[in-house]
Every structure is written in C-alpha cells, then in structure tokens.
Amino acid sequence: MRTLMHKITFAGTLGAMLLGGGLARAADALPPVQKMGSVEYLSGGIGVDESKAIEKASPHWPLTLEFAAKDRQRADFMADVKVRVRDAHGHDALDATSNGPFLLAKLPPGSYGIDATAAGKTLHEHVTVKQHQPARAVFVWAGDAST
C-alpha cells in the first residue's frame, strides 16, 4: 500500500512539473513586455509559437490590436505598424511600433482613439476598455499594404 501511495504521489508531482513546464514554454514564447509611461505593452506574433502564445495571453490584457493586409486573393499579417493610442482627452496613452501582427496593451478603463499606420496608410478605430472585459480592434488594410 505504501508503494502505491509513493507511485501516486510521484505521478502527481510529475504531472504538475510537466504542466508547469508547458506553461513556462508558452510564457517563454511571448515577446518581452515593454513600457511607455505607465502603460505596459508587448507586440509580435511572428512565427507559430509566438503567435499562439500571444493569442493565449490576449484575454488577460485589456486591449488587443491585430494588423492585416487583404487583397482579393488572400490576407497577410502585418508587422512594423506605427500605433498611436489617445485617451478621451486626446493625450497619448501609447505611441509604439508593432513588431508583428499583434499588440497587447495594459490600458486603464476608458475610451481610446487608435491610429495605425502601415505603408503610409493610416486607419482609425475607437475602443472602450472596460474593467475585466478585454477590448479588441482589428485593422485591415485593403490591397498590398505589406510592401
């Protein structure tokens, strides 16, 4: 009986270690968190592992932005997008360049105007960030804005 209990304990410990390792790998795949003033953000999503890690982390961030270019035949993710987020008073909350098709930001609750610029074309969106309710905005450039 004692041997059985040791096996069960070992199996439980091993399972917890494997699960923890999986979570650590997902966190390792995230790009580094950066900061502008009091706003933390991360951007990226180049590569399958990083893209999946960002999608998994997205619900835990108040704001998710996604960038793509679409023509008649296909849609491509965008990188090197200049992002400017302004609060309801017109003050810059975030001014950054996204390193990939996703940008996650920890903004306080409120209304924000967002300008996203790629290949000289600027798109505008408005979002409302609410407490415990993540907001998402998707920017899609028509044609081949990725060049």
Regions found by a protein language model. Give the residues of each.
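Bacterial N-terminal signal peptides
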Residues: A11-G20
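Short amphipathic beta-strand segments in non-cytosolic proteins
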Residues: K82-D92
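Surface-exposed loops/turns
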Residues: P108-P109, Q131
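A short tyrosine-centered beta-strand micro-motif
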Residues: G110-A116
